Amino acid sequence: MKMKFIPAALLAAAAGVVQADETSGFNLKAGSGITFKSADGTASFRVGGRLQWDYDSTDSDISGKSDDFDVRRARIFFQGKYLDWAFKAQFNLAESGTGGGSAEDLYLRYTGFGKMARITVGKQKEPFGFEQLTSSKDISSLERSALTEFYAPGRNAGVQLHGAGDNWTYGLGVFEAAGNGSDDFGNTAITGRVTYAPIQTDDLVLHLGAGFTSRDAALPANQTDAYNIELAAASGPFHTQAEYFNANMGGVDVDGYYIQAGWVLTGESRPYSNGVFKRVKPSSSKGAWEAVLRYEDGYGKFSDVGLGTTEGKQTTVGINYYPNNAVRLGLSYMDGKQASGENGKEIRARMQIVF
């Protein structure tokens, strides 16, 4: 099998340039990486990544004041497909709070049953949570909600059966429950999610979803069972999403919810695909503007405003500018309050490039 490559610069993608050569099997698209395909279409390889530079200023009654300018995320990924087999390897080069140097995704996937049933083995996102399963490069707010950060398990090693139809998705898997991506299966988790979109057009979407996770632990007090309910909708330039979370942790019940709304001021619609929203794609050379508002209440991880894991409330307002498909500039203000009365605030600015 013969694969032909044409050299190209990643900066072309950053500038919003789209190039394609069907005869050579090479494609460079803004915000979508570089794809190589074999002449007979049986094999493909793609490389891409993201870089997020953040400035954030936090003022908390608990942790005081802090100002930081650092790399929020710097990732590169490689993914490919040959016949009925696919893989993805995504590496975290740098990340605030963790330092980077780890594998975000590292899995092998069998696709021979078609889109309705696929098997993925390796480190991957567990199927839980609308906002969690929306990529960090696509979420409307600069940071996920405090509720998602606390309840959603994120990435772990495991085996998942998942699939999708025209307006529905499902996922069910067994994962290691250590929460650090290790290969120790001493503690396991069973996690699942289903979604259904009774309305799904280019300009109108109604999404319903639900998920659960049951996580074993070495100590009974650390056993966790959680579920969530999802609701999302879009109508032209307006979009909204909400989630309710409930967990029993060693006999202690905690819960919370968030609701978020956005308005694309320049008229574009936020795309919806496979049970999640995608980022705004500007329809003109002037770019697209988006305003975002979120409110959350309950037990969650309010670390962005310096309040830690606690019962609290938080309001977020933000504005995003998308000059092209690859670049995003964002500004947000978060105001949080613990149930006990302590306050925390954060101003965050971000420059993001996806290649």
Residue ranges and their predicted role:
Residues 1-20:
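Gram-negative bacterial Sec-dependent N-terminal signal peptides
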Residues 6-8, 108, 247, 300:
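Short amphipathic alpha-helical "recognition" segments used for binding
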Residues 22-27, 59-63, 134, 212, ...:
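Outer-membrane beta-barrel pore domains
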Residues 25, 29-214, 254, 258-283, ...:
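Outer membrane beta-barrel
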